[in-house]
Amino acid sequence: MELNIRRLEESDYETLVKWWDWWPGWEAPPKTLLPDTGFIVEKNNVGIVSAYVYMTNSKTAIFDWVVSNPEYRESDRKNAIRLLIQATETVLRDQGIKHIFSFVRHKNLLKIHEDLGWDIDKKPSHEIIKNL
């Protein structure tokens, strides 16, 4: 079967929380931290990988909170990640976005971004958040 991508729905959050909780060192972000826009790649109605997109008041978007289904181990997993990134790029480009930021920890995800032409800062910065 073919990989498909669709917009995230509110009902997907519970599934994504299970994925985040499975991965060591990760904690699901609270729903109040997430934007309304996001995408998920599926095959045969099984979610593989998803991400959220924050829109800004400039020509910039933030591609973040990438998480994958830990139980999905088929050979097209990397292709699903590539599809997620490339489809998001296309949607954002069509909306007039000129720049996309992403925050990446996992070395394989970083490599996929690099292979797709993203500029990788060689001096990583820290993610800082304050809950009010």
How should these model regions be labeled?
Residues 59-76, 126:
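Conserved acetyl-CoA binding element of GNAT-fold acetyltransferases
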Residues 74-90:
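Conserved acetyl-CoA-binding loop-helix of GNAT-fold acetyltransferases
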Residues 101-111:
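Conserved beta-strand-loop-alpha-helix junction that forms the acyl-donor binding cleft
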Residues 1-29, 124:
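Short amphipathic alpha-helix that is part of the acyltransferase structural core
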Residues 40, 46-55, 61-64:
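Conserved beta-strand in the GNAT
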Residues 103, 119-132:
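Conserved catalytic-core motifs of GNAT/GCN5-like acyltransferases
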Residues 111-118:
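Conserved active-site tyrosine of GNAT-family acetyltransferases
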